[in-house]
């Protein structure tokens, strides 16, 4: 099963509803409870400058892209056991695809 095409406008709504309480996604934005996600696309796990990651995040050693984000956002604690991200995940594949499309667009 492939990853569906995402709609960044729908993804922005999901980000505002489910992510923005803990994350920013703007160039030079401050970290909140979670790291600023600007530039996350193409970056290795646990690498946002100035954010205190768990050893689990730093040690995962993958690069964030459509495939890795799609799997992670379904169940973050399963994908990176020991992460401090408390969000349970997005079970619907289309919601994950929309959110990823927004993250990719907003973090360039």
Curated annotation (Swiss-Prot):
Biological role stated in the UniProt entry: Electron carrier protein. The oxidized form of the cytochrome c heme group can accept an electron from the heme group of the cytochrome c1 subunit of cytochrome reductase. Cytochrome c then transfers this electron to the cytochrome oxidase complex, the final protein carrier in the mitochondrial electron-transport chain.
One GO CC term on file: mitochondrial intermembrane space
Keywords for this protein: Electron transport, Heme, Iron, Metal-binding, Mitochondrion, Respiratory chain, Transport
Gene: cytC
UniProt binding sites for heme c: 19, 22-23, 85
Pfam families from the UniProt entry: Cytochrom_C (PF00034)
Cited InterPro entries: Cyt_c-like_dom (IPR009056), Cyt_c-like_dom_sf (IPR036909), Cyt_c_1A/1B (IPR002327)
GO molecular function: electron transfer activity; heme binding; metal ion binding
Domain of life: Eukaryota
Originating species: Apis mellifera (Honeybee)
Family classification: Belongs to the cytochrome c family.
Protein name per its UniProtKB record: Cytochrome c
Coiled coil: none
